Design a protein with these regions (language model features):
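Amphipathic alpha-helical/coiled-coil segments positioned at domain termini
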Residues: 314-324
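Helical catalytic core of nucleic-acid polymerases
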Residues: 1-234, 243-245, 323-325, 337-362
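Histidine-centered active-site/metal-ligand motif
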Residues: 135-139, 295, 317
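Extended, charge-rich low-complexity regions and/or helical-solenoid scaffolds
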Residues: 294, 308, 312, 326-330, ...
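C-terminal, non-catalytic extensions of nucleic-acid polymerases
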Residues: 254-269, 277, 303, 330-386
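Active-site palm subdomain of RNA-directed nucleic acid polymerases
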Residues: 297-316
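Conserved pre-motif C helix in the palm subdomain of viral-like polymerases
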Residues: 107, 286-302
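Gly-rich Lys/Arg/Thr-decorated short loops/hinges at beta-loop-alpha junctions or inter-strand turns
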Residues: 143, 279-287
Length: 386
């Protein structure tokens, strides 16, 4: 049977890809930084490079540690990447070319884009775009600030929060009341973080039968949309079939369908029970506006980097795997963040949605902006990391 390898998949899949053309490493420090951070954890660039140079044999041996007899999928990915990184470093010292793709990704891209979009210092600092002199761990900081039991719990909060989930959802994760959930997130990220729920709520309110696709333009002029729909609605298809006595047959399909409401504002399909067949269907997906604007901002930054590098690399969301171009990637990503600060993507998207709207829409919410300046981004160095 065929086995597919997904270039946008797990770590072990992306680690199998390499540059089609060999290249000579010119800035070895980028590779040494990655090696030291992978083995010892986050640290400043200069410290990582000094540590590697002081004990090269140790780091090379650690990168090439044998795989266990029963590795997990995660361990397999780490082993593949680490051994290939060691081979690339060795190629440099031997004066040889390499095909290796060096990888760095955003340190919580969702928090970066929300923070910059709302000029929120409280959000930007833990996302490593607020001018901190060292690389920070946004999950660990949230754990400490809210007194959570584990870093994984902080991840469980960040995921729904940064995708526009309601305070009801966050309250269930935090096991508290809705009001307490609101207090918790504002304690962590200031009042601007409440813009997320406002935008998501507005996206639900403006999604109607005549406006199932909310349309806007990205900073670089591409079209973007957020679609309100119902997942896996059952559809019975009837067709002529002379092979049976009835003369017809039928087939049950499940299909995503655009959001559709009755004159009473009730869903025509989706969210019902088996006793109400008109409403039988899957999950209603109409709360995606905030997340989709964020994804469009992600994609804009990615296009900036692809243009700057001539398309050389493997592109996985906000994870960049490139052949000897990481310094250029970092510089370009910072320029994208600075442009994003000026553009105010979330507000701009809502303005565009209103201009494309069919009918009269609810007024867009007034967003709360913080006092962060562009200097915070200019003075940041760890927005991408191994």
């Amino acid at each position: 049977s065929e086995v597919g390898i997904n270039p946008h998949g797990k770590h072990f899949e992306t680690s199998l890809f390499e540059s089609a053309e060999p290249y000579t490493i010119t800035d070895i420090n980028e590779y040494l930084y990655s090696a030291a951070v992978i083995i010892d954890g986050r640290m400043p660039h200069h410290e990582a490079i000094d540590k590697f140079n002081a004990n090269k044999d140790y780091y090379m041996a650690e990168l090439r540690k044998p795989l266990s007899d029963t590795p997990s999928v995660s361990e397999l990915g780490e082993w593949l990447y680490n051994t290939r990184l060691a081979d690339a470093i060795e190629s440099y010292y031997n004066g040889e070319e390499t095909h290796f793709l060096l990888s760095e990704d955003c340190t919580n891209g969702g928090l970066q884009h929300g923070g910059i979009g709302f000029h929120s210092t409280e959000m930007m600092i833990p996302a490593n775009v607020g001018g901190a002199p060292e690389q920070l761990d946004s999950h660990g900081m949230l754990q400490a600030k809210l007194g959570l039991t584990s870093r994984d719990t902080a991840k469980d909060i960040h995921q729904p929060l940064l995708h526009g989930s309601s305070m009801h959802t966050l309250a269930s994760v935090l096991e508290c009341s809705v009001r307490e959930a609101e207090i918790f997130v504002t304690k962590a990220y200031g009042k601007s973080v409440l813009n997320i729920e406002k935008i998501a709520d507005w996206g639900v309110a403006v999604a109607t039968n005549n406006n199932t696709s909310l349309l806007w333009k990205t900073r670089d002029g591409f079209n973007a949309q957020s679609i309100a729909y119902v997942e896996t609605v059952p559809l019975t298809i009837k067709f002529i079939a002379d092979r049976n006595s009835q003369g017809w047959g039928q087939l049950l399909l499940h299909k995503d369908m655009p959001l559709l409401k009755s004159v009473k504002g009730e869903l025509v399909y989706g969210g019902g029970s088996s006793s109400n067949k008109a409403k039988v269907g899957g999950t209603v997906k109409n709360r995606g506006l905030y997340a989709n604007v964020t994804h469009s901002v992600d994609a804009t930054a990615l296009r900036d980097i692809i243009r700057a590098t001539g398309g050389k690399g493997l592109w996985k969301h906000d994870n960049f795997l490139v052949p000897g171009l990481m310094t250029l990637v970092r510089q370009t990503y910072r320029q994208a963040l600075l442009a994003e600060y000026d553009f105010k993507a979330y507000d701009a998207a809502m303005v565009d949605i209103l201009s494309n709207y069919n009918g009269e829409a609810p007024a867009k919410p007034t967003l709360v902006y913080g006092d962060a300046t562009k200097d915070s981004i200019i003075n940041s160095h760890y927005y991408l990391a191994p």
